[in-house]
């Protein structure tokens, strides 16, 4: 009995001392120089030739290095060399006074090395051939790059090159792309290569700052082509090899993904402090699907930075007397900082224009629905006012966006304010579309439309979907919501197996062409594998786009953009949705950074004070011990009578035995 009590007390003692931070979700000590964050769903690919989603590029931009990057500090955004010695030299080839080709001469820096990798037996130096090899991969039928459709219009010989590779793969399971020359991408010497494009395309330089044009060593391609690798799903999709400041140390998307410093990284200097970068040793991203647990871990100090969900907004943000967002007292007491930026992005609901009901020439149905979906209400209910209702594809901050150029199909001027048209206007359009009061003449019942969404398990999603059902119900339309896992959802959009769906776009580069191309027919998702997810086609819009894309940023270009916007607003392939305003919170141990809405390779500029973090985590996560002390007292009260009884019994027995 005495021994049992001793064991109970020991267990109680160790539970209150050794496990002082028993809610710490991390495997290693938080006093290490490691940045902690979260992700809610696994990226689909980390192949730089394929990755296009923001959750993918935020990872691979730390690993792969295209030739150019954005200056971290300058605004407006400006391109500068990354692996190049200088900005590309541009030469124009003319014929009869017309530019028929543009040639970019790119010279890379020597002594840039790849990360350690089993495909590279020695410390492998970056060479020009690696960049050319990657450009060739963009045309490979085994890669299916989403930018093939765009690049085939520009890179000389690109379309024919894809056909050549298609034929070659009919006879071989793997081919060395070095054996197949591409007219539009040629190696000049070890550190120099040329890219040749048709005509003039000023935005091409922006593409050279994207992961698509990062280098890929032939050895890595060969390594992953081995049958044993494919059988075990060991591919470049999941095991990147780059020259960047970080490498992927652990890739378990069902638990966590870990980026660690690349030991072969050449080293750069911070543009402000002049300290060596990168400064953070590791980035640990933990899978955390639910917004509330993510938020709680941030408040406990276990995540270093955080966004703000709708559930947490009121506890984090309040408005000052001028209506500007500021931190609540509780956030200020923790030393948390707030950063706000208007995101150069658009989130919209798309109509699959290949669908026989919502697509094609059924624009009055699309217009009716577009009027009905009250995005002003959506922004207040679910975004806490953190957004601007979209009138077209171009977001604020990008040339071509004009606050006073409203979408006249959906809005009208009410004094100095744009106001959404009344539901009566939408019902009239719906009747003209052949669905009076939302009745489908084929069935005599309410028109049923399918809305495909990704399944995240987020409680916010249920409320938003219920709200969306009510919006369609205003027209008498029944909305059938089809939940799909994220990767499967992307596949359904890619094959056109959707009717209505949510989609979004974050700017690749700060030019209106990067948003207007989302509605260019040659970028159709189903036919061309491009980023026109709605598969919208209109020859007039295409003609205007081809004019706008190469024009200088001036008044003439703005006039053409206005004409283009009026056309696509009339056709309504999108319910234009919202341009978000990003709110980011950082703990006091995270050094201030300058938000960059375009660049993704900014992890290297971040710095933390891990000792301060550990101290505050201990302060904020002290266990509440009084229930345990009450339990201890209760145990003592129970055990004392038992001990006394036990002692008396043992003592009595001893006396009896003695007198015998």
Give the ranges of each region predicted by the language model.
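Periplasmic-binding protein-like
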Residues: 359-403, 418-427, 568-576
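Structural transition elements
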Residues: 246, 388-435, 455-463
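Gly/Pro-rich hinge or "lid" segments in bacterial periplasmic/extracellular proteins
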Residues: 71-74, 164-191, 196-282, 289-293, ...
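Long beta-strand-rich cores associated with HINT superfamily self-processing modules
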Residues: 586-621
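Extracytoplasmic/peripheral linker and loop segments enriched in polar/acidic and small residues
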Residues: 22-23, 28, 332-335, 342, ...
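N-terminal lobe/hinge region of extracytoplasmic solute-binding protein
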Residues: 38-97, 241
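Extracellular/periplasmic solute-recognition and catalytic clefts
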Residues: 249-260, 286-354, 376, 380-382, ...
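Ligand/substrate-recognition segments at binding pockets and active sites
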Residues: 100, 253-255, 419-423, 431-507, ...
């Amino acid at each position: 009995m005495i021994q049992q009590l001793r064991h109970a007390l020991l267990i109680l003692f160790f539970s209150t001392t050794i496990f002082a931070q028993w809610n710490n979700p991390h495997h290693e000590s938080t006093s290490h120089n490691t940045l902690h964050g979260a992700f809610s769903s696994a990226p689909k690919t980390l192949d730089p030739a394929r990755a296009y989603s923001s959750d993918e590029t935020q990872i691979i931009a730390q690993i792969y290095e295209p030739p150019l990057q954005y200056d971290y500090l300058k605004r407006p955004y400006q391109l500068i060399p990354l692996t190049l010695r200088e900005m590309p030299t541009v030469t124009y080839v003319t014929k009869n006074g017309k530019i028929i080709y543009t040639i970019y001469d790119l010279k890379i820096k020597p002594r840039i090395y790849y990360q350690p990798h089993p495909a590279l037996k020695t410390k492998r130096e970056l060479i020009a051939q690696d960049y050319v090899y990657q450009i060739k991969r963009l045309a490979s039928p085994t890669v299916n790059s989403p930018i093939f459709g765009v690049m085939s219009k520009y890179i000389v010989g690109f379309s024919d090159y894809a056909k050549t590779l298609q034929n070659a793969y009919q006879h071989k399971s793997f081919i060395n792309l070095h054996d197949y020359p591409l007219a539009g991408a040629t190696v000049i010497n070890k550190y120099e290569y040329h890219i040749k494009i048709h005509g003039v395309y000023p935005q091409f330089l922006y593409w050279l700052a994207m992961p698509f044009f990062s280098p890929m060593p032939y050895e890595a391609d060969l390594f992953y082509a081995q049958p044993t690798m494919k059988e075990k799903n060991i591919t470049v999709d999941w095991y990147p090899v780059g020259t960047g400041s970080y490498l992927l140390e652990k890739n378990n998307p069902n638990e966590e993904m870990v980026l660690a410093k690349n030991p072969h990284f050449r080293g750069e200097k911070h543009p402000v402090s002049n300290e060596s970068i990168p400064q953070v040793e590791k980035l640990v991203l933990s899978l955390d699907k639910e917004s509330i647990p993510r938020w709680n871990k941030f408040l406990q100090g276990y995540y270093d930075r955080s966004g703000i969900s709708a559930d947490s907004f009121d506890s984090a943000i309040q408005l000052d007397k001028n209506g500007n967002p500021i931190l609540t007292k509780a956030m200020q007491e923790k030393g948390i900082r707030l950063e706000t930026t208007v995101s150069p992005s658009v989130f919209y609901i798309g109509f699959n224009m290949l669908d026989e009901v919502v697509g094609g020439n059924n624009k009055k149905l699309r217009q009716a629905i577009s009027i009905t979906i009250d995005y002003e209400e959506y922004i207040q209910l679910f975004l806490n006012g953190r957004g601007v209702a979209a009138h077209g594809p171009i977001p604020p901050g990008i040339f071509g966006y004009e606050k006073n150029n409203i979408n006249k199909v959906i809005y009208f001027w009410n004094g100095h304010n744009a106001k959404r048209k009344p539901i009566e206007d939408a019902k009239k359009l719906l009747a003209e579309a052949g669905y009076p009061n939302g009745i489908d003449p084929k069935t005599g019942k309410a028109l049923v439309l399918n809305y495909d969404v990704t399944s995240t398990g987020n409680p916010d999603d249920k409320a938003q979907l219920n709200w969306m059902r009510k919006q369609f119900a205003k027209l008498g339309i029944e909305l059938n919501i089809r939940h799909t896992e994220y990767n499967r959802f992307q596949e359904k959009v890619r094959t056109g197996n959707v009717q209505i769906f949510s989609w979004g776009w974050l700017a690749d580069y700060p030019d209106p062409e990067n948003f207007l191309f989302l509605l260019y027919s040659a970028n159709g998702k189903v036919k061309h594998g491009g980023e026109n997810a709605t598969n919208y086609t209109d020859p007039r819009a295409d003609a205007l786009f081809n004019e706008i894309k190469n024009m200088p940023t001036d008044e003439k270009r703005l006039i053409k953009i206005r004409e283009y916007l009026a056309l696509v607003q009339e056709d309504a392939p999108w319910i234009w949705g919202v341009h978000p305003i990003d709110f980011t919170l950082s703990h006091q141990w995270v050094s201030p950074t300058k938000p960059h809405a375009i660049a993704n390779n900014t992890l290297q500029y971040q710095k933390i004070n891990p000792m301060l973090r550990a101290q505050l985590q201990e302060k904020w996560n002290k266990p509440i011990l009084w229930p345990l002390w009450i339990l201890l007292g209760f145990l003592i009260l129970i055990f004392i009578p038992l001990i006394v009884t036990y002692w008396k019994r043992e003592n009595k027995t001893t006396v009896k035995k003695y007198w015998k």
